[in-house]
Amino acid sequence: MRCLTTPMLLRALAQAARAGPPGGRSLHSSAVAATYKYVNMQDPEMDMKSVTDRAARTLLWTELFRGLGMTLSYLFREPATINYPFEKGPLSPRFRGEHALRRYPSGEERCIACKLCEAICPAQAITIEAEPRADGSRRTTRYDIDMTKCIYCGFCQEACPVDAIVEGPNFEFSTETHEELLYNKEKLLNNGDKWEAEIAANIQADYLYR
């Protein structure tokens, strides 16, 4: 197979453009030339301005100082972040944070030991034990949540018929040991007592959509 040099290839393309495809519109050589890129063509000669710009970028680090100038300009602009933990952003009423067990205003715990939350939990993080009381009602004797298993899906809160188990607004509950993340009933009730005002406000704000 004979290799065509660049001049020969250009002449062949020009002849094909003048002849045109059968029954079709003829192609202009300029359009053909613009369509193809010839890898063996030499780069066009650079003028003095291009040489000067390239030398300035290489020797004077103009791009570096341009980037530093942009960085320094942000020192005089309004910050886009907040000064956490001294400042905190707003949370959605549907925010799913640390778990809590709620009480009625009388002080009676809401949980009726139906175990729907335990059954629906996809991570199997909830363990409940219950026994009947003298009045025939059921109350939990054990309510444990392994917070290291929890995926914060909110299914337990959605399944609860009495709004007993909720995921409250608190997200700052980091610990130093694994045992501190094994919540029992007392810990969950204490969380509910601590965050009841915020939890009730969030439920009230979201009740139309539940």
Curated annotation (Swiss-Prot):
Tissue specificity: Expressed in all tissues with the highest level in heart and skeletal muscle and the lowest level in lung.
UniProt binding sites for [4Fe-4S] cluster 1: C111, C114, C117, C121
Domain 4Fe-4S ferredoxin-type, first and last residues per copy: 102-131, 141-170
Keyword entries, A-Z: 4Fe-4S, Disease variant, Electron transport, Iron, Iron-sulfur, Membrane, Metal-binding, Mitochondrion, Mitochondrion inner membrane, NAD, Oxidoreductase, Primary mitochondrial disease, Repeat, Respiratory chain, Transit peptide, Translocase, Transport, Ubiquinone
Enzyme class: translocase
The keyword Iron is annotated on this UniProt entry: yes
BP term (GO), one: mitochondrial electron transport, NADH to ubiquinone
Regions crossing the membrane: none
Organelle transit peptide residues: 1-34
Protein name: NADH dehydrogenase [ubiquinone] iron-sulfur protein 8, mitochondrial
Record organism: Homo sapiens (Human)
